[in-house]
Each structure stands twice: as structure tokens, then as C-alpha cells.
A protein has these predicted regions:
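A short, N-terminal "cap"/entry segment at the start of jelly-roll beta-barrel domains
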Residues: 1-50
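Conserved short histidine dyad/triad with adjacent acidic residue
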Residues: 33-44, 52-71, 102-105
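Short acidic-glycine-tyrosine-enriched beta hairpin
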Residues: 49, 76, 87-107
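Short glycine/proline-enriched turns and hinge-like loops at secondary-structure junctions
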Residues: 50-52, 69-71, 91, 111-112
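Structural motif
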Residues: 54, 74, 95, 115-116
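Short, conserved beta-strand element in jelly-roll/cupin
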Residues: 56-62, 69-85, 122
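Double-stranded beta-helix
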Residues: 111-141
Length: 141
């Protein structure tokens, strides 16, 4: 049995009660209908806090979440199911952790067979967490 399987079974009861979102103001064409996310704790989550954002993200098989970075935010992922690659740096399976310090560009690619469910945590200053906007544009040189 996979290490996070008991956690996934526990989350199954919570998932229908979450407010799942299916995009942002501007979603890259290849990402439409390929992912959803729900905040568990944070400014928009059922557990209200301005100190951290914790949530779940579900990716469709074969989905590529474009390269992006978070200004002033440290982001960690915990793979709950499926398999993903970050920046083509190997394959991460259930139980794997991924860590992105502030400003590090990263791209998530999901395996072709199964969807991937990841838990994520964002840590940063309150103003950074509250004002975070995702941009999929490459920084100008």
C-alpha cells in the first residue's frame, strides 16, 4: 500500500465539501479543464488563516502545468496519488515531497496513465500570501 493512501482515504470524505476552482483569471490554453484546486486553510479556505495557505490540486493525466514562480512564497508539494515530474528532474510518486523556494521557476508534468493529486503549502509574509497572482510569462532578461 502506498504511504499516503490512508491520508487520501481520509480526504475522500472532505473533498465533496471543498470549493473546487478550475482556473484563474487567465488560464493558458492547454490548461483549461486539466486541473482543479481547493484551499483547505488560508484566506479562502474553510480554515481561515493569513499565515499559510494549504490546499489540494488535482491534475488530469498528461497535464503540464506551465513554468511559473511565486514571488516571496515558499511552496511545497506532497504527492498523494499519481506521478509527476517537476522541471523534468525525475519522477515523483506518492509520498514524495517537492520544494520550491521563493522565485524558483517550476513546471509540473503529470504521467500519462493516471491523474495526480497533490497537497500544497505556501508560506510567506501575509501581504505576499494575500496578493499572490500567478503569471505564466517568462521573466524579461
Amino acid at each position: 500500500e502506498q504511504r499516503p493512501a490512508p491520508l487520501v482515504r481520509t480526504l475522500e470524505r472532505l473533498v465533496p465539501r471543498l470549493a473546487w476552482l478550475y482556473g484563474y483569471d487567465k488560464v493558458p490554453k492547454g490548461l483549461v479543464d486539466r486541473f482543479a484546486w481547493a484551499e483547505l486553510a488560508g484566506p479562502q479556505g474553510p480554515v481561515a488563516t493569513e499565515e499559510v495557505i494549504i490546499g489540494l490540486v488535482l491534475f488530469a493525466p498528461g497535464c503540464t502545468y506551465p513554468s511559473h514562480a511565486h514571488t516571496g512564497i515558499t511552496e511545497s508539494y506532497f504527492v498523494l496519488s499519481g506521478s509527476v515530474s517537476q522541471n523534468d528532474d525525475g519522477v515523483f510518486t506518492p509520498g514524495s515531497m517537492l520544494f520550491n523556494p521563493p522565485g524558483r521557476r517550476h513546471r509540473i508534468t503529470v504521467g500519462q496513465r493516471d491523474p495526480a493529486l497533490l497537497a500544497y503549502a505556501w508560506v510567506g509574509a501575509r501581504d505576499e500570501l494575500a496578493g499572490q497572482k500567478l503569471s505564466f510569462r517568462k521573466p524579461r532578461k
